[in-house]
Structure formats: structure tokens, C-alpha cells
Amino acid sequence: MSSARALRSIHFPSSMAERDIARARLAYEECLYLQLALRLRNDGGMVEVVPYTHTAGGHLTALRRALPFSLSDEQEAAFQDILHDMCDGDHVMNRLLLGDVGTGKTAVAACVLAVAADSGTQSCVMAPTGVLARQYADKTGPLLSQAGMSWALLTGATPAAERERIHAQLQSGELDVLFGTHAVLSDNVTFKHLSLVVIDEQHRFGVGQRNALRAKGPGADLLVMTATPIPRTLALSVYGDLDTSIIRHRPVPGAGVSTRVLTESSRDLAYGAIREAHAQGQQAYVICPLVEPSDSADDLEDVPGIARDDEGRVTVSVPLHDTATELDRLRLALPGLSVERLHGRMPAGEKDRVIDAFKRGEIDVLVSTTVVEVGVDVPNATVMVIENGERFGLAALHQLRGRVGRGSVSGTCLVMTHSKGNGGVSAAQDRLRALEKTSDGFALAQMDLRLRHEGEILGYRQHGGVTLRFVDLDATRILSNGPIWTRSSSCGMLATLTPWRRVPCAMRSPRVIDISSRRSAEDENHRR
């Protein structure tokens, strides 16, 4: 069927069968053009990009010895997949490492950094907050030093003299690894030989920011890590533009987190959970979307994880909680407990002071914005209360939930919802119901994709709108029907189509690797 006939038939079909054939024809064409565009973009358009060929050596061996543990089977499998990408020299690595909090993504990343150093090149790790970047430096840095590698930390709070020293060491090649925040995107930050870019908590960065860092090392391999890929990232992995490795199990099983969605009438249950945790010597978080009572919906525009409509706008129809008012309210409601607040507008030194006090157990309840979403590790914190839960996206909610239950005691996440009326409330309630039902980050990402759509696959919007008019992504079906991806990339396109759910097959077979499933299959074969 020609394109012109398909357009006529989809509007004026003579039968349901003709309508389905027309939609299949247009879906095929849509997928074909998308795949050609992705291939052209990955090949650098008219500019040839030569991939690096990395080699593993002494730094990696020394780093493995320095680790206080051996990599789990799933971690090792993920590392081997990444190592294969880095060493084959056929293409530039573009890989997503997906794993929930505590699955050991950081240990895998440390091994990858050692491979880049073994190759005589540099690597950069970008984190969304100074807290997380410093955590990398504090935990991973000493291991790199034991492996004979040099590293530095660059954030917005780095003193000018130290910043200049780091710039000079990067340009000379003296530094092997740079940990940093958005500060690494500065034009003054130049590398002698950047061959590896690692981006943690990938959902907190925009497309332009990721591209800007990668541009500092043409041909550099890219590894992005997250617990819940945003819709655009999941769509790219589905279309074969982003190879994916999944680690489903923690090397050391945690106590777990139970999640409940509460309305305002059940607020006493939330306060009761905080009191009970305090009685047992444990701590709690209370998360608010705003910093000050004078803030408005406009102040949410730059807040990561805030839910938006299909046009990317923040819409508010219910009162929003702020940290200042909540601090006063909790001090009245919870007498005898030490309650402090934390937010991104505080000076870096003050933020560090509050976080350190919370880690030492000097603060019982920490009222905060999403600044604690990543990089804050307090095993003694067991209760998380999230105000205006309907205002946050699934990725942010899942990450916030991951701040509790990190020790030997199970955690409790209580999501307060204030939604009334219609509009976007239904989608918000769908998000919260999904959060209650599962703790699987990838399952939540699939739900996020269905609710918020894929955004601009070839552009900069990471969710909202529908780029594809005739193709409907369903990651569950795509990943469960794995054999279709093994067909030759030269065979063209294959679409698994039903009247209302259409799944494309990429021209290039993406390597979506569920390590836990592969291990189970290997175990089953061994038993046989």
C-alpha cells in the first residue's frame, strides 16, 4: 500500500481490515524514518567519530583488590557487558545501567573508571547535586587512589584557587577522573583526553546538559545510571538507541520499604509513624515541593521530578506545602523531637552541616525539598513522608522512597495526597497507585512512559506530548518478546501490530540485557 493510499484509507476505510493495514503501513514508515534519523545522529551526521578502543590492565586489577567485597554475579555481568562495549572499538558506547538503590551500580562504575585510566585516558562522573558528587568522592575516591589513579571533585562550592588547579590538571592529563556537578559543564573545564562520561541519576539532567558534557570528548563512551529511567530514556532503549543492562537484585538484600498513599484526613497516621520511629531511636524525612510560603507554582518550574502536563507546564489546583511552614507545624505537632530543614537555596556549608547532623542522629526529623532525593545515605532513617505526592513524577517518588529502609530495619513511605477535582488528578492518582503496588523501578518507568509519553526522541523534551503518531510504545511487550530483536539489522523493520497497540522492531538490534533473567536461565540449564 502506498503512503498516499494509506492516508486515504485511514480516514475513509472501506473496512476494518483496510484501516488496520493503513495504520500498519504508516506505523512502519514512522519507525523507518525514526531509525534512519537515530542512525544518522549516532554516526555524527557528516562528521566521522572514531570510537576509543579501551584496554583493561593494572588499574582495574588493583581496584578489584581494593574493593572490600567481590562483585555479585549480576554486577560482574553488567561490568563485562560495559567492558565489551568499551573494548570492541566498533562503535561508541551508549549504555544505560539500570538498578534500584542498593544494587551496586557505583561499584560497577568504579571498575569502568579504572578501565579508562588503564587506556591512558580520562573520565568524568557527573552527579546532579553537590551532596551526591561529594559522596562519590568520599566513597569511590579512596578506592581509585589505592588503584594508583588521580582524581578531583569539582562543584559550585569549590574555591577559585582549587578550581584553577583542577582545570590545569585536566588540561595536562594529570587527573584521571573528575567527579562533579553541573560545574563540569563550564567552558573552562577542558580535558586532554576524555574517553568516558558517566552520568549518575540520569533523570535529573536535561538532554542538552548530557550532550554538552559528552562534547568535551568527541567519541567518548557514555554510561548513564538510574533507578527509574525517564520516558524519553526508556523510549530510546526500546528503539535500540540505548543499550541497556539491568541489575534487579541487591548484593546484600535490604529490609525493604512499604508504601501507603494517605489523604489529609489520615495525617495523624503519618505523625504517629514518626513518633513510633523516634521511640525506637529512628529518624524520619518530610518532603515538601516548595521552600518558602511565598513561593508559587512558578517556583516549581526548575524543580526536578515535579509533575507536569503534556505541554510541560506545572499546574496547581491544591495548596502546596513548603519547608518553612512545615517546620513550624511539625515542631508543634511533635514536641520533644529535634526538627530541622534542608533545601537547595542554603549555602553549601550550611547544607553539609545539616546533613552531617542528621547522619549523626542529632536531628530526628528532617524537613526537606527534593535535594535529598539522591546522595543522602542515612541507614537509621526509616520513615519518609512526602507532602503533595501528586505533584511529583514517578522517578522522583521512587528515588525519595529509596532514602529509607537502607539499614536493617524496614522503611515506611507515606505519600500525602491533596488532589481534588478533575484534570490531571486521574493521572496523578494512577502514579500513586502504581507506587503503592510495586517497588520495581523499571516497572514504574514503564508506567511513567504510558502516563507521560516519550517526549521528543530526537529533541530535548524528556516527556510529554507524543512524538510518534501511529506507534504506541509498550515496553512490557517489547522486552518480553525478546526473540524479535535477534533478527538481522539488515532485514528492515518488523512491527508487531494489533488495532490499538503497535510495537516497532528497531533496524539495529538493541542489547537489552536483564541480568537476573539470564542468570536464572543459566541456573536452570545447570540443574538440567
Tell me the role of every PLM-derived stretch.
Residues 1-66, 460:
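Upstream accessory/linker segments immediately N-terminal to the RecA-like ATPase cores of bacterial MutS
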Residues 4-8, 25-34, 369, 398, ...:
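Non-catalytic, well-ordered alpha-helical scaffold segments
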Residues 31, 63, 75-78, 82, ...:
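Conserved hydrophobic/aromatic pocket- or pore-lining residues that grip, position, or stack substrates
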Residues 50-57, 248-251, 407, 457-462:
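Flexible hinge/switch segments at interdomain interfaces of large molecular machines
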Residues 50-98:
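Conserved pre-motif I regulatory segment
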Residues 88-433, 494-496, 521:
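Inter-lobe coupling/hinge segments of SF2-like helicase ATPases
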Residues 412, 420-528:
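C-terminal accessory region of SF2 helicases/translocases
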